[in-house]
Amino acid sequence: MKKKAGNLVIGIIFLAGLSLLLYPFVANQWNNYRQKQLISGYEQVVSEKEAAEGIDYDAERKKAEDYNEALLPCVLPDSFALAESSGVDPVYMNTLNIAGDEMMGSVEIPKINIKIPIYHTTEEEVLNKGAGHLEGSSLPVGGPSTHAVISAHRGLPSATLFTDL
């Protein structure tokens, strides 16, 4: 009886150790799958919205460029001070928010094999599920005197994100 109990304890310890060893791999695979699903869902919503009512991409781009121009005289804010502030600019949140889910697009880096969603803001909740755009920096539409800041975690045990950069 003691031998069975000892084998059971050893088996439980082995399974616990194996679980700890496999957790980062399994969690990373799950997050990669989830990010692909989110991006596919975003692209599908945008396609459906475009087919149903049409999306004026020129107007969306103009709105983003106007937002970027309004930032020109400003200094890039301190991201930590921004995180402590209570309000989020509604103009910012509604710009490049075509699907209405706060996702503004995705960033793909083929060399390191990542494709992750970009969300408005850099709050902890956002950075745990993808990349975040720093409010107060230029929106990522290009143009002169624009500097978009896209940030993501690196070194999370549950997701790769920007770990390989």
Could you say what each language-model-derived stretch is?
Residues K3-K4, I10-L165:
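Solvent-exposed, non-transmembrane regions of membrane-associated and secreted proteins
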